[in-house]
A protein has these predicted regions:
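Glycine-rich loop(s) and the adjacent beta-strand/alpha-helix scaffold that form part
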Residues: 35-38, 42, 50-52, 236, ...
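Loop/turn elements at helix/coil->beta-strand transitions in domains of secreted/extracellular proteins
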Residues: 39-43, 128-129, 223-226, 260, ...
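FAD-dependent oxidoreductase catalytic-site/capping-region signature
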Residues: 2-18, 133, 139-192, 197-199, ...
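Conserved redox-cofactor binding core of oxidoreductases
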Residues: 76, 120-243, 247-249, 311-334
């Protein structure tokens, strides 16, 4: 059946509606598709990107080949960041089955107990640490075995390094951190972690374990799941205060699908855009952008946040790093090592040693994340590829950044990307933590376990000797950790977009389930918390629809 709207033929699907339409087959959407269909609900899963057929999606280090490709990456670019010397930053976001879990750095980091207990203090019942821990454990299959913290038997495989690539250098970083005075830990996913440890990664043996691998593929054979790739959602169908379905483009066709409930899982840079394109947002702002107001909800697109990362680079000596393995004939050797033994540089992740430190002694929990990797980038190389001489990088990230940005549509045209800014390092506390974090990383490099192997500090270098100089360096080189969150904030106040059950306030049949609902930032990488949120949301949706 074809109806006309603004001169465009809209093809309406069969009258039989779905129970749930999930927009986005990413870290959250794949989990929802699995859990909801497992409970007998009929689900339509829409993904704007394609299938993750390319082999590089599944090789751990292969993400470096996939980022930035228009077919697989949204390639969001911010407006000039005033506090970063007016630089515009690229924000990589997966546009493929699995979403960013197919192109991220694979780190499995939950954050601190205090992050979630703070949400409960904000009035969000059921989001404290003790309430969300079962959902972390439910999804996880920790290779070392389950315990009170880790799960076993879940769909998502999580493991420590198997062959421990560049182990001598990585071990020395951990030892040096203890020599400096950080606690010695083995697991940074305990409720209150402080100290550095070898990474836990979403891998199954040698391969990446994305949510497409873990959750979606096992559900694809179910008759009550329909998956459509290349389906770019244009907006929601709203009727009498309820979300009745979605309108999406599939090739040259504009299609409509109807459902009892719609769930936006398109991520913190897409979910608020879809809401605003549908007339849900701040009324004055929508009218200024030429969008008809359907539901005034002023918090949409506000509270945007992300982890800012600032790198240090060292030239190392007398010890092996990844730099030497990725040039010339050595790269061919590494490919053989990967396929024959599941070892070598292709198993490496951006944070092979990671963990947390407490900069302010009075802080309730650690306030800085450090991520170390055994290579340094060549600024003159394509895609900032590794240098040829041995190197070590340490990135510092404030755990709970206070800087806030915003993202908004400036046109009713769905093809026009929204405008956004993170306002990185606009807050003095974030500036303080970055400066002190760089000084901390330098002190770790000075410890006996590591100092003999540090030939030189490449950046920021000796010229950055004062706090002001370090901060200026940070403004020049800081980048996004690609953890955008908060733009459809969960809360109980007038600027909240969703309530504690992730329902869009003031509307029926509409939820948001992705990082955009975070009221405040979690301490660390966001993939694991996103999966947890989806697990919890699935239970709530099933309960409500079966009521």
């Amino acid at each position: 059946m074809c109806g006309l709207q603004d001169g465009v033929c809209i093809v309406r699907e069969s009258e039989a509606e779905y129970d749930v339409i999930v927009v986005g087959a990413g870290s959250a959407g794949c989990v929802l598709a699995n859990r909801l269909t497992g409970a007998g609900l009929r689900v339509l899963l829409l993904e704007a990107g394609g299938v993750d057929r390319n082999h590089f999606f599944h090789v751990p280090a292969g993400f470096t080949r996939m980022l930035g490709r228009p077919a697989n990456d949204w390639n969001h670019v911010s407006e000039p960041e005033r506090s970063l010397n007016d630089r515009s930053l690229v924000h990589f976001k997966g546009k493929v089955l699995g979403g960013s879990s197919s192109v991220n750095g694979l780190l499995y980091v939950r954050g601190h107990r205090a992050d979630y207990d703070h949400w409960r203090q904000l009035g969000l019942e059921g989001w404290d640490w003790d309430s969300v821990l079962p959902y972390f454990r439910k999804s996880e299959n920790f290779v070392d075995g389950g315990d009170a913290v880790h799960g076993s038997g879940g769909a998502l495989h999580v493991q420590r390094p198997v062959h421990r690539y560049c182990a001598p250098l990585m071990d020395r970083i951990v030892t040096a951190s203890v020599e400096y005075g950080l606690p010695a830990i083995d697991d940074y996913n305990t409720p209150d972690p402080e100290g550095l440890a070898h990474a836990q990664s979403t891998m199954r043996g040698r391969w990446r374990c994305s949510t497409a691998d873990a959750f979606l593929r096992p559900a694809l054979g179910r008759s009550n799941l329909e998956l459509r790739t290349g389906a770019d959602v244009q907006g929601l169908i709203l009727k009498d205060g309820r979300a009745a379905g979605v309108r999406y483009r599939l090739g040259a066709k504009l299609l409509e699908a109807r459902s009892r409930e719609v769930v936006l899982s398109a991520g913190a840079l897409k979910s608020p855009h879809i809401l605003e394109l549908s007339g849900i947002g701040d009324g004055e702002r929508l009218r200024a952008s030429g969008i008809q107001v359907v539901h005034h909800l002023p918090g949409v697109g506000e509270n945007l946040m992300d982890h800012v990362a600032v790198p240090l680079a060292f030239r190392v000596q007398g010890i092996h790093s990844a730099n030497q393995d990725v040039h010339g004939w050595r790269m061919a050797r590494e490919i053989l090592k990967f396929y024959l033994f599941g070892a070598g540089v292709l198993t490496a992740t951006p944070g092979m040693v990671t963990g947390f430190a407490r900069i302010r002694p009075e802080a309730a929990s650690a306030d800085l994340q450090l991520m170390s990797r055994p290579f340094t980038s060549d600024p003159g190389a394509k895609n900032f590829g590794p240098e040829k001489l041995p190197g070590l990088s340490i990135a510092v990230c404030p755990c709970r950044p206070r800087s806030r940005g915003r993202i908004h549509a400036d046109s009713p045209d769905p093809a026009r990307m929204p405008k956004f800014v993170m306002n990185f390092l606009s807050d003095e506390e974030d500036q303080f933590l970055v400066v002190e974090g760089i000084k901390l990383a330098r002190r770790i490099a000075e410890q006996p376990a590591l100092k003999p192997h540090i030939k030189a500090e490449l950046s920021p270098g000796s010229a950055a000797a004062t706090d002001a100089a370090i901060l200026e360096y940070a403004r020049q080189v800081a980048y996004s950790a690609y953890h955008a969150a908060g733009s459809c904030r969960m809360g109980v106040d007038d600027l909240a977009v969703v309530d504690a059950r992730l329902r869009v306030r003031g509307l029926q049949g509409l939820r948001v389930v992705d990082t955009s609902v975070l009221p405040t930032m979690v301490s660390g990488n966001t993939n694991a918390p996103t999966i947890m949120i989806a697990e919890k949301a699935a239970d709530m949706i099933i309960e409500d629809l079966h009521a």
